[in-house]
């Protein structure tokens, strides 16, 4: 019928059952249908799983904040990734978010059984060629001389 009914249908049929979002409370209404005036209109927040999915979506504007929120809810086994991902985010945000994108895509493609707990070692199982290439170039780059590094950067600037 309208966009609001579509949004609430998606919430009820997809986001809530998959625990991507959950109801955070209800706001009272002064106007509108009596039933909604009595029970209020619900508002929602992203769960930890929802935050992880949001980190994989490039159109999301405040992903730095979401990353901090995600790790504030992390288990001890997930903490090992927080420091390195936070450091990589400062110098290489596109690469960092591509890791989340690959992780969530692997889940959507049934290559990873569960999104949580967050474990980047699961990515090793999917054998992603672009990650292998990125690791290879980084390993090679750190071994180059200063001049060769400068030349490599100039070359990459020309092709990207």
Where are these regions (language model features)?
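Exposed, interaction-prone assembly regions rather than primary DNA-binding/catalytic cores
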Residues: 60-158
